[in-house]
Amino acid sequence: MITEINDIFTEINDLLMRKISVARAFSHLLPLTSHLFISLLLLSSCGLRKQTATGDNAVSAQPVGPAFCADSAYAFCEAQCDFGPRTMNSQAHDDCGAWIMEKFKSYGMSVTPQQTLLKGYDGTMLRATNIIASYRPELTDRILICAHWDSRPWADNDPDEANHRKPVLAANDGASGVAVMLELARLLREYGGAGARGHEDTSAADTSRATSVSDSILAPPHLRTPAPPLTLGVDFICFDAEDWGTPQWDDTPSDGDTWALGAQYWAANPHVDGYTARYGILLDMVGGQGAQFYQEQQSLHYARSIVDKVWRASQVVGFGSFFPSREGVGITDDHLPVNRVAKIPCIDIIPYYPDCPQSSFGPTWHTVNDDMAHIDRNTLQAVGQTLIQVLWSE
């Protein structure tokens, strides 16, 4: 091997001396240049072997698209929490909804508020607003990304029973999914290609902190594969009234239909007649500390190929540890009416904590501790960059 490397070294030196006359002035650097070139060849061959092993995925197995800014998503999450708990029929709910719509508009999205009255489990009439923000609404080829934006009115899973009737701030269970969608909307406006209509605001939500987590994980921009402009539309839907499901302290029988009320309404009454999309991705609790996203059972049942697509994308961008190839449990969530009624294959990116005694959804689920102190930029980054990979790979 040493002899072969020396032969290669000699050939490279000879080639450089013959072809690059200016190199004569820097001949003392040639051995270093040659060794560097050989090292790059060896590294390249390792990369080729890895690509060959992945077969058909080799062509797409490179990070594409812009870097997701976790600091910006974190600030979007915090901004929602600053309104207080966004419980149904509250002023905080109305004010935050208006802010979300204006923020999407500022990133050039076409925004459609879908307002309706929905009946809660206890007969309470809920003033609900599904918020639909569309990138390039003129295109018929579309992808749906969704999350719920309301807060749980009761911390009924809190370890302290005295908190069970207090509202949840919902930093993770509500705000985190919307925050990721807002940052995606900002990046679509800036990098998506054909511009969206509306006001223009390409600034990140928060630039006061140091560089984004992505800078330490992803390849530098000049080493990443450039992506062509998107040729499809994207719809961001903020579903309302997801978390008004029957509380644990209430004995009223429930079959699961008291949850995801806004998604149920939209699926039966889409904002566009005959609306369809290639697929949908639901983001639920995507900012928690220590989160891992197992493959949810209903997602595997209705949209296994989309699960495979998203989990592969997480590996490509270096976040496979957040998306283990393990099966979780089945969840009653907004993706069910999207699958069953709207007939759009939709998956649920939702955490699974198999060893957490408080809840398999994590220690802060439906407790007063679901606040910004328990939001992790790394989790936001993992989910956001994975979605960038999915969108820019289409």
Which residue ranges define each predicted feature?
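C-terminal motif of bacterial Sec signal peptides marking the signal peptidase cleavage site
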Residues: 44-45
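Acidic/histidine-rich catalytic neighborhood of metal-dependent amide-processing enzymes
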Residues: 165-207, 215-219, 227-305
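N-terminal capping segment at the start of a domain
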Residues: 51-96, 107, 357, 361-374
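Active-site-adjacent substrate-binding region
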Residues: 115, 125, 279, 286-394
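A non-catalytic alpha/beta surface segment that caps or lines the substrate-entry region
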Residues: 78-79, 85-138
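Solvent-exposed loop/turn segments at secondary-structure junctions
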Residues: 87-88, 117-120, 137-139, 149-153, ...
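Catalytic-core environment of secreted peptidases
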Residues: 70-76, 83, 107, 129-189, ...
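Second-shell loop/turn segments in exported
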Residues: 62-67, 82-91, 118-121, 163-174, ...
